Design a protein with these regions (language model features):
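C-terminal motif of bacterial Sec signal peptides marking the signal peptidase cleavage site
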Residues: 17-19
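A short beta-strand motif characteristic of beta-propeller blades
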Residues: 51-62, 90-104, 149-155, 194-208, ...
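Short loop/turn segments that connect beta-strands within beta-propeller blades
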Residues: 52-55, 86-89, 144-148, 189-193, ...
Length: 412
C-alpha cells in the first residue's frame, strides 16, 4: 500500500593561485549574477544574496516562501507574517496572525512552502500538543496575499499538515496523519468550510492510506498538478501526482529500493521543462532517470526509464532540497549528486558530460541566459560552470553557513 509521510559561457584559461585557506579561483567571471542561497548560520535560517563576480554578500533576507516572480518572499517572525521585497530587503507589509503559526515545510530539509502555484494564497499552520506526542488538533489560516488579509481560519481535530492549495483558493489539500507512518490525503472545501467526506485516493489502484517520506515537489506551470517525490523504507520510490482541480491523485512507481536498504534512494530530484510538458525524476546515486507525462489531457504516466553509470560515492547530504534543472530548450537535464554533476540528453537519456567529480553537489541553478550553471557543494562552496562547454570557470566559498538550497539565480 503506497503511502507518504511528511516526515558562463566562459572558457577556463588557467588557475590563479590563492593564499592558504583562501578562495580558489579559476577565472573570475566578467558578468555578474545574484545567487539567492538558503543557508543555516549561527542557529538561524536565512537567504543570502551573493554576487557571483565579487563573491560578496549583498544582503540577507529572512528565509521564507517566494512567489514565482520573486517579487515577494513571505516569512513568519514571532506572530507576524512579513512580506519582504527580495530585490531590496525592504518590508512591503506585515500582518498580525493572532497566534503562533509556521510556514509548512516544502522539502525534506525544511525549505518553507504554503503558497498556491500562482502565489495568491498562502497557508500557515499551528498545532495543539497531546500526551502521545501527535498533535491533538490543527489550526490553519488561508491568507489572500493580494490584500494581506486572513481569508479563512480552519480548525480541525487531529493532526493535519498542508499539502497544496489551488490557484483559486477554493481547494486545500491536507495530509491527515493516522499514526506514526500511515496517512490520508484529504480535500478541504475552503468556501464551504468542511472536509470532503471522501479520501483523495490513488486512481490507478484505489489505495487510500499512504506511507513514505516526501523529499521535494514541483507544480506544473498552469497550476493544475503537484508532483511530489516520495521514498519509502522498504519499497521502491514513487511520485505522487495530485490534481489541484479535484479529489484524485495518481502514484507513479519508479525504479529503485527502500531507503533503509539503500541510502542512495534519498538522492532523487525532480525537474520540469519550461512548458510543463515533461517532468523528469533522476537519481545520480542509483543511476536512474524517468520521463513523466504530466497529464495535461490525460492521466500522468511514466513514459520511459533508463539507467546510467551511478555515482561511485553515495556520501554527502541526504537531505538536499532538489538538485536538477532542465535547459530552456528542453534538450538537457542537469543533475547534481554525491559525485558531482551529470548532463543528460533528454532525447536519448544518455549522459553526455560530467563535472566536479570530487564534489558532493546539493543544489543547482541556471543563470537567466543559461550561460552559466551554478552548483552548491555540501561544504558550502559554489562552482560556476559553462553550460556550453561544461567546464568549471570559478570556485569560491562565500562562507555564509550550511547550504540548504540555491533558490534563485537572477541577473545583476
Amino acid at each position: 500500500m503506497k503511502s507518504m509521510r511528511m516526515v558562463g559561457a566562459l572558457i577556463c584559461l588557467g588557475v590563479l593561485v590563492a593564499g592558504c585557506g583562501g578562495t580558489q579561483e579559476l577565472l573570475r567571471p566578467t558578468r555578474s549574477d545574484k545567487l539567492y542561497e538558503a543557508v543555516t548560520a549561527r542557529g538561524s535560517q536565512l537567504v543570502s544574496v551573493i554576487d557571483s563576480r565579487s563573491h560578496s554578500t549583498d544582503r540577507r533576507l529572512p528565509l521564507g516562501v517566494p512567489t514565482g516572480d520573486w517579487r515577494h518572499i513571505y516569512s513568519i517572525v514571532s506572530t507576524s507574517l512579513i512580506d519582504t521585497d527580495p530585490q531590496t530587503g525592504a518590508t512591503r507589509s506585515s500582518i498580525q496572525l493572532q497566534g503562533t503559526y509556521q510556514l509548512p515545510p516544502a522539502t525534506a530539509n525544511g525549505l518553507p512552502g504554503g503558497l498556491s502555484p500562482n502565489g495568491q494564497w498562502l497557508v500557515v499552520e499551528a498545532f495543539d500538543g497531546s500526551a502521545n506526542g501527535m498533535p491533538s488538533s490543527t489550526h490553519m489560516l488561508v491568507i489572500d496575499t493580494t490584500t494581506s488579509r486572513v481569508w479563512r481560519k480552519i480548525d480541525l481535530g487531529g493532526y493535519f499538515r498542508f499539502d497544496a492549495v489551488s490557484n483559486d483558493g477554493d481547494r486545500l489539500y491536507l495530509i491527515q496523519h493516522l499514526n506514526g507512518k500511515e496517512y490520508y490525503v484529504r480535500l478541504y472545501d475552503v468556501i464551504g468550510g468542511k472536509l470532503d467526506d471522501n479520501i483523495v485516493v490513488d486512481k490507478s489502484d484505489g489505495n487510500q492510506a499512504m506511507v513514505g517520506t516526501r523529499l521535494s515537489g514541483v507544480a506544473t506551470p498552469d497550476g493544475h498538478w503537484l508532483f511530489s517525490m516520495y521514498v519509502r523504507e522498504h519499497e521502491s520510490p514513487f511520485i505522487h501526482a495530485l490534481s489541484l482541480d479535484g479529489p484524485y491523485a495518481f502514484c507513479l512507481d519508479l525504479p529503485g529500493h527502500g531507503y533503509v536498504d539503500s541510502g542512495a534512494e534519498m538522492h532523487w530530484s525532480l525537474a520540469i521543462n519550461r512548458d510543463g510538458s515533461r517532468l523528469y525524476a533522476v537519481n545520480p546515486a542509483t543511476g536512474a532517470v524517468a520521463v513523466i507525462s504530466p497529464g495535461a489531457n490525460d492521466a500522468p504516466a511514466v513514459l520511459r526509464t533508463a539507467r546510467f553509470d551511478k555515482a561511485m560515492s553515495v556520501a554527502g547530504s541526504a537531505s538536499a532540497a532538489n538538485a536538477a534543472v532542465v535547459s530552456a530548450d528542453g534538450a538537457t537535464l542537469v543533475v547534481g549528486g554525491p559525485a558531482g554533476i551529470a548532463w543528460i540528453d533528454t532525447a536519448s537519456l544518455r549522459v553526455r558530460a560530467h563535472a566536479l567529480a570530487d564534489w558532493s553537489v546539493s543544489s543547482l541553478g541556471l543563470s537567466p541566459g543559461e550561460q552559466n550553471l551554478y552548483a552548491i557543494g555540501d561544504d558550502g562552496r559554489i562552482a560556476v560552470i559553462s553550460m556550453a562547454t561544461t567546464s568549471v570557470s570559478a570556485k569560491f566559498d562565500p562562507a555564509e553557513g550550511r547550504p540548504m538550497s540555491l533558490m534563485r539565480v537572477a541577473a545583476a
